[in-house]
UniProtKB/Swiss-Prot annotation:
GO terms for cellular component: plasma membrane. Keywords: Cell inner membrane, Cell membrane, Lipid transport, Membrane, Transmembrane, Transmembrane helix, Transport. It comes from the Bacteria. Belongs to the major facilitator superfamily. LplT (TC 2.A.1.42) family. InterPro entries: LysoPLipid__transptr_LplT, MFS, MFS_trans_sf. It comes from Photorhabdus laumondii subsp. laumondii (strain DSM 15139 / CIP 105565 / TT01) (Photorhabdus luminescens subsp. laumondii). It is a multi-pass membrane protein. Pfam families: MFS_1. Catalyzes the facilitated diffusion of 2-acyl-glycero-3-phosphoethanolamine (2-acyl-GPE) into the cell. The gene is lplT. It is found in: Cell inner membrane. This is Lysophospholipid transporter LplT.
Length: 398
């Protein structure tokens, strides 16, 4: 055993602080979403407006994509995370004070867009090598546990008292802000970068091109974009599927079903960290195809207990699929354009996929397609798309 392995364990003080900050920030993100959805339902907004809420959030990611990567690399990432969580806190308070929920959630989106490159980029500064996959596994597990608890708390509190639900979300963002102060001060990776707007846009476009021409990065970008686009669409599909198929109209049941997915992703993320390395990352592809298959199976059944089991299995496949792809992209970014830029490009791809999938989903619901039919079509399309990516990637490697 060498000295570096003794003095640099995976769970350092900095890593623990990052995980705590991520947990409470993600907790609030998910609780707030379900609280606002309950607010929209209480105020009789149409069903198709629900995905519009997420589209407003996603637009912040897309519009800020050329800039947040440079911010993450230009400033210490611990300070960037602090600023981003503070902006989320501002958005939550805006909603608590009675302002338009779409406006408040857009402010939360600005904070989230700034936060993402820093939270993943900081992992590279706190660990390295194959431990990066394990660090990503911990980050994903922390995030999914937050989704699990945040979704449930958001749903149950919204059924009980909507105002308290919103205040709890703001409190959780406040705790995340405090946790950021316990992350050791880090140095900026690329302090020499300037702030010329035209150059930033040009640099970002160049970064997109560099990553796209890297086989590993391109594969990861497409895979993670499909995963998160599908994941957020499934979340809204569940909100409509539950009352139609199960006949349950509360706010907590859809959150519990989302929790089942989260439990599965925790298991899958742990398995990915244990059995998949950067050299064997392509083992994740069968799991990606099976995500779509599980969506189809889930959509056509009518049992709440079967729903729990099917969504846990779906989540396991999701964890096995996403964790190796995230690690592959970060490693590709470190070798080319910097992790901050790489994560910003990844966010752009993922959020464009979310925007397109949510827009299509909103349109399908607006024109009256039954929710079960929507689920079958969604799962089939996802499975076929990931299968095509798998075949295309094998062709590229050969």
């Amino acid at each position: 055993m060498n000295a570096s392995s003794v003095v640099q364990p995976l769970l350092t003080r900095g890593m623990k602080a990052v995980l705590v900050s991520q947990f409470f920030s993600a907790f609030a993100d998910n609780a707030l979403l379900f609280a606002i959805l309950a607010q929209l339902k209480a105020q009789f907004y149409p069903d198709w407006s629900q995905p519009i809420l997420q589209i407003v959030f996603v637009l912040a990611y897309i519009l800020l994509a050329p800039f947040v990567g440079q911010i993450a690399d230009r400033f210490p990432k611990d300070r960037v995370m602090l600023f981003a969580n503070s902006f989320k806190l501002l958005g939550a308070f805006t909603i608590c004070l009675g302002y338009d929920p779409f406006l408040g959630y857009a402010l939360v989106g600005v904070g989230a867009a700034s936060y993402s490159p820093a939270k993943y980029g900081i992992l590279v500064e706190l660990t390295d090598g194959d431990r990066l996959v394990k660090a990503n596994g911990l980050m994903e597990a922390s995030t999914i546990i937050a989704i699990l608890t945040g979704s449930v708390v958001g749903g149950f509190l919204s059924d009980w008292n909507l105002a308290i639900a919103l205040l709890v979300c703001a409190l959780m963002y406040g705790i995340a802000v405090v946790a950021n102060f316990f992350i050791p001060r880090l140095s900026a990776v690329r302090r020499d970068k300037g702030w010329n707007l035209k150059k930033m846009l040009t640099d970002f476009a160049s970064a997109c091109c560099i990553l796209w021409h890297n086989k590993g990065a391109r594969f990861s970008l497409i895979g993670t974009s499909l995963f998160w686009g599908a994941g957020i669409t499934l979340r809204f599909l569940l909100v409509l599927w539950v009352p139609v198929v199960l006949g349950i109209s509360d706010n907590s049941t859809p959150t519990i079903l989302n929790v089942m997915v989260a439990v599965g992703i925790i298991i899958g993320a742990g398995a990915a960290a244990r059995f998949i390395t950067l050299k064997t990352v392509h083992r994740c592809m069968p799991a990606g195809v099976l995500i779509g298959v599980m969506v189809v199976i889930f959509a056509v059944q009518h049992s709440i207990w079967a729903s729990y089991v099917l969504l846990i299995i779906l989540g396991i496949f999701g964890g096995l699929f996403i964790v190796p792809l995230n690690a592959l992209l970060q490693e590709s970014g470190r070798q080319t354009i910097g992790v901050g830029y790489a994560i910003a490009v990844q966010n752009l791809g993922e959020n464009i996929a979310m925007l397109l999938m949510l827009g299509l989903y909103s349109l399908v619901i607006k024109i009256g397609v039954p929710v079960v039919t929507t689920g079958i079509g969604f799962g089939t399309l996802l499975a076929l798309t990931i299968t095509s990516l798998w075949i295309w990637n094998r062709f590229q490697r050969n």
